[in-house]
Amino acid sequence: MRQPMTTLPRDEWHRTIAVNLTSVYGGCMTAARHIDQGSIINISSGAGTGPVPGSGHYGAAKAGVNSLTWTLSAELAPRIRVNGVMPGAIPTEVMLKALKKSEDQLDELLEEWNIPLGRLGTPQDIGSACVYLASDAASWVSGEILRVGGGAKPK
């Protein structure tokens, strides 16, 4: 729901925070209690790094995910590494609906977002970043939010 904060219904605020932040907290707490060592990877969003008119509630939730990631990386070290992945433009059904775009408008979206690598991302791009963060190759990486967006910066 894209709506200015001043007219956003309170129940929509609570629902968005529950889905996008409280659920991440719950997953992190469950993992922290049940694994002796390893990696937790949270999914963030560029919306959590600055103003997103009409989606302030979502941005607030994702900023909370970033803060949770940084805090847990310190609290769970050295046994568990905690990082985040910040996906860029991935043309999922949910994103297209939120932007009121159709699959026929992907070229328009690519141009609008000015992505230096010249293509929209795929779920596999995000998965590959998560595999890296979970691997031994990232054994000295913790408390980081990895942008995976083809070189584009969140607006």
Q: Where do the model's predicted regions map?
A:
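Substrate-binding pocket helix/loop in short-chain dehydrogenase/reductase
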Residues: 3-5, 9-14, 107, 111
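Active-site helix of classical SDR
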Residues: 28, 61
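Alpha-helical segment proximal to the catalytic Tyr-Lys
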Residues: 33, 73-78, 139
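Short C-terminal tail/terminal secondary-structure segment
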Residues: 50, 130-131, 142-155
